Amino acid sequence: MKKVIEFYLSGDRVYSTREKAINQLYNNRGYGELKGNKLFLSLIEAAYLVERGWIKVLDEDRELTFEEIFKLGKRKDEDFDIKYLVYKDLRDRGYIVKSALKFGSHFRVYRKNAEHSDWLIWVLRESEKLSPNDMTARVRVAHGVRKNMVMAIVDEDNDVVYYKIEWIKF
């Protein structure tokens, strides 16, 4: 992308009405959610695209830095930092990453040009405890919607390791 696309802060997300944003980001690369003539991005998506230099985010007339967007995200979600690391890692690998809140997970992940997602991603810190019941519930939901459940574990060095959790029938 050559020219940076302007987005505007609106609560816990950003939006643009520019056709270029809709074509380049939504239609061609799977970013955001289209509602009417507005493309909405989550703060994680916005931070990622600002860091890449593809968009700029304005709050009133002031341009927000990557760090400011990150702080906004962290204020709204204490795990924003690790979710961002996982989001960035998956996007950098070429996957389309969307919210999976309605599935009880953090992200749903699509292969490029796929109509349906293959994976549900749950993000955890390495030091975090997860009960067997929590894990079972997440796997059941994933299985019920024909997705693979993946735990993305972020360690103290901010490295991400992915574990596929499966339901096995004997």
From Swiss-Prot:
SUPFAM superfamilies: tRNA-intron endonuclease catalytic domain-like, tRNA-intron endonuclease N-terminal domain-like
Classification via Gene3D superfamilies: 3.40.1350.10, tRNA intron endonuclease, N-terminal domain
Gene Ontology MF, one: lyase activity
Catalytic residues (positions): Y110, H116, K147
GO cellular component, one term: cytoplasm
Pfam families: tRNA_int_endo, tRNA_int_endo_N
InterPro entries: tRNA_endonuc-like_dom_sf (IPR011856), tRNA_intron_Endo_cat-like_sf (IPR036167), tRNA_intron_Endonuc_cat-like (IPR006677), tRNA_intron_Endonuc_N (IPR006678), tRNA_intron_Endonuc_N_sf (IPR036740), tRNA_splic (IPR006676), tRNA_splic_arch_short (IPR016442)
Keyword list, A-Z: Lyase, tRNA processing
GO BP terms: tRNA splicing, via endonucleolytic cleavage and ligation
TM segment ranges: none
EC code: 4.6.1.16
Catalytic activity: pretRNA = a 3'-half-tRNA molecule with a 5'-OH end + a 5'-half-tRNA molecule with a 2',3'-cyclic phosphate end + an intron with a 2',3'-cyclic phosphate and a 5'-hydroxyl terminus
Oligomeric and partner information: Homotetramer; although the tetramer contains four active sites, only two participate in the cleavage. Therefore, it should be considered as a dimer of dimers.
Function, in words: Endonuclease that removes tRNA introns. Cleaves pre-tRNA at the 5'- and 3'-splice sites to release the intron. The products are an intron and two tRNA half-molecules bearing 2',3' cyclic phosphate and 5'-OH termini. Recognizes a pseudosymmetric substrate in which 2 bulged loops of 3 bases are separated by a stem of 4 bp.
Family note: Belongs to the tRNA-intron endonuclease family. Archaeal short subfamily.
Protein name: tRNA-splicing endonuclease
